[in-house]
């Protein structure tokens, strides 16, 4: 390697986005340390103020509505370490961006609640034939917001390799739309093979949307990757890009792994879009994870889950009814399975 190549490599390391983000975060940490040192000069007065503030905060927290475990998790550190606990609580509570995101998600959930209702016939069956399962189904619908379905079958994949082969076959069958939502995406064999299929499907007129978590910008994908995807005709966005700001909002990540194809087929599980998940790349020895494929009525919940998260950062409201498949599954013999299915999910704010 000559000197010029070495300089270019050093320049790239110094000015790549992840390096700059880390440096800016370090600057903010140093600033806080300087502030703490300044406070030490007036420690007694400052400690007294924080002790009084902590006492007020404890009274406030105890009297607010909410989960008792959440309250205890704050009350203990505030009482044990008044300076740190009180300031940390104020810092977390003042995270406006987190509150705005939570409010946006709650608004979308209220809007889409009408699409997530258990069929009355299924409710009647459960009430009469399986009271225990009926209680569980009622709990999921009332508190989690997800209904119970029939006419659905599932296939289990014991490895990422098995899932990838089935996923490619199903993607090739797409006629209307393909939705993908993942936590980790990395260029390589797995993502490369899927991307080639998506490119072909775009040319065939299939709508393709792709959403991934912003942590991928550190080392896995360039910050401009959504722009590249959009140039291919794939609607793409990052959820919560990493920014050089000290904030609890950075911890709200989208860990979901969802694929929806034409509203009748879905994939989920623990497999991300990176080569270590199919053992083409070794990180921590042989990678063992699982996934499932769902076909039938229950895919409706996966479709809505994806659109809800996509809608979080959109200014306009999504037309959900356009993507909720209205195919009658009752007469589809290959979907006749005994039992019921309740797909459910969380969100980055949970």
What is each residue range found by the language model?
Residues 50-122:
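Transmembrane alpha-helices and immediately adjacent membrane-cytoplasm interface residues
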Residues 44-48:
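Membrane-targeting alpha-helical segments
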């Amino acid at each position: 390697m000559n000197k010029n190549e070495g300089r270019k490599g050093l320049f790239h390391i110094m000015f790549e986005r992840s390096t700059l983000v880390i440096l800016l975060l370090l600057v903010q940490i140093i600033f806080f340390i300087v502030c703490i040192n300044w406070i030490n000069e007036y420690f007694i007065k400052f400690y007294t103020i924080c002790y009084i503030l902590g006492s007020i905060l404890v009274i406030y927290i105890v009297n607010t509505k909410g989960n008792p475990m959440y309250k205890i998790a704050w009350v203990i550190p505030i009482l044990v370490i008044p300076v740190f606990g009180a300031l940390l609580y104020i810092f977390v509570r003042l995270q406006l961006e987190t509150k705005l995101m939570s409010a946006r998600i709650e608004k979308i959930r209220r809007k889409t609640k009408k699409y997530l209702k258990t069929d009355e016939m299924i409710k009647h069956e459960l009430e009469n034939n399986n009271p225990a399962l009926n209680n569980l189904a009622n709990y999921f619908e009332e508190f989690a917001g997800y209904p119970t379905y029939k006419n659905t079958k599932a296939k289990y994949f014991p490895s990422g390799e098995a899932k990838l082969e089935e996923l490619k076959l199903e993607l090739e069958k797409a006629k209307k739309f393909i939705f993908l939502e993942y936590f980790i995406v990395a260029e390589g064999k797995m993502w490369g093979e899927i991307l080639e299929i998506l490119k072909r499907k775009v040319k065939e007129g299939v709508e393709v949307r792709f959403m991934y978590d912003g942590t991928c910008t550190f080392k896995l994908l360039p910050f401009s990757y959504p722009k590249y995807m959009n140039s291919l005709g794939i609607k793409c966005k990052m959820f919560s890009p990493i920014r050089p700001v000290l904030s609890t909002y950075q911890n709200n990540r989208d860990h979901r792994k969802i694929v929806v194809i034409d509203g009748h087929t879905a994939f989920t599980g623990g497999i991300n879009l990176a080569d270590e998940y199919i053992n083409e790349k070794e990180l921590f020895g042989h990678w063992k994870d699982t996934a499932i494929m769902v076909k039938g009525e229950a895919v409706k919940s996966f479709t809505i889950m994806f659109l809800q998260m996509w809608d979080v950062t959109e200014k306009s409201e999504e037309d959900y009814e356009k993507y909720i498949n209205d195919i009658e599954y009752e007469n589809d013999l290959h979907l006749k399975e005994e039992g019921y299915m309740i797909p459910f999910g969380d969100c980055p704010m949970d």
